[in-house]
């Protein structure tokens, strides 16, 4: 396959630059870090909820229930503080998603997705 000169030059220029100095790479790394932090926070939140649920589920009467809640005030405070924070967070909008000019890397993302059945299914489900 013969690569057009413009595409060849763009790819050659991209390959010469240090990846860690590329602005698009830096933006994607920053977004990755943000999403990993969010995943860790949510996993911790779910773990705390499950822990409290199991403790409450093992109570046999009202007094035990009240005792479990009293013993776990810090956990309850943490759960409701985090839950309130999650409710205040706005869900991802298009402004939050880094916009990369994929054409400068000679990649037509729509064609790439259309050629891959798994990616196309994810795209149609709204997950891409």
From Swiss-Prot:
The keyword Membrane does not apply. The gene is AHC2. Keywords: Cytoplasm, Nucleus. Present with 981 molecules/cell in log phase SD medium. This is ADA histone acetyltransferase complex component 2. It is found in: Cytoplasm; Nucleus. The keyword Transit peptide does not apply. Its main location: cytoplasm. It comes from the Eukaryota. One of its GO terms (cellular component) is cytoplasm. GO terms for biological process: positive regulation of transcription by RNA polymerase II; regulation of transcription by RNA polymerase II.
